[in-house]
């Protein structure tokens, strides 16, 4: 009988520690965050009152899958995983000067397309 009480005590302590850790995080910490749609959003750093600068921001498609054997045979350096992705890029833009002599792109339309600059 005393043997079962020890196990019950250990289980209760473990459960209470787990619940304490779980409740110490803000709401939604463990849930998947929604990824915003790819669209122009205001860049607060370059924008001025009355002259907003927009940059494309948001999420697009990406996936990884095992490299097909037929493709693997043609690779100089074989890799087991192949990945595909698209990035949120400007479909149309205008170049503007801000802060005197800094040229930036003011994005007017965005879409998901080939990633040219990869962020690490």
From Swiss-Prot:
An example Gene Ontology molecular-function term: follicle-stimulating hormone activity
Protein name: Glycoprotein hormones alpha chain
Signal peptide: 1-24
Glycan attachment residues as annotated in the record: 80, 106
Family recorded in the similarity comment: Belongs to the glycoprotein hormones subunit alpha family.
The protein's assembly and partners: Heterodimer. The active hormones thyrotropin, lutropin, follitropin and choriogonadotropin are heterodimers composed of CGA, a common alpha chain described here and a unique beta chain which confers their biological specificity to the hormones: TSHB for thyrotropin, LHB for lutropin, FSHB for follitropin and choriogonadotropin subunit beta/CGB for choriogonadotropin.
Disulfide bonds: 35-59, 38-88, 56-110, 60-112, 87-115
Entry-linked InterPro entries: Cystine-knot_cytokine, Glyco_hormone
Gene coding for it: CGA
Native species: Macaca fascicularis (Crab-eating macaque)
């Amino acid at each position: 009988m005393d043997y079962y009480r020890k196990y019950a005590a250990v289980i209760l302590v473990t459960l209470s520690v787990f619940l304490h850790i779980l409740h110490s995080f803000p709401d939604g910490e463990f849930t998947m965050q929604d990824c915003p749609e790819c669209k122009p959003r205001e860049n607060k750093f370059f924008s001025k009152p009355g002259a907003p600068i927009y940059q494309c921001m948001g999420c697009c498609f990406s996936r990884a899958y095992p490299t097909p054997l037929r493709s693997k045979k043609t690779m100089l350096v074989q890799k087991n995983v192949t990945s595909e992705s698209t990035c949120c890029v400007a479909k149309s833009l205008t170049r503007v000067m801000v802060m005197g002599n800094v040229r930036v792109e003011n994005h007017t339309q965005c879409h998901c397309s080939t990633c040219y600059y990869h962020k690490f």
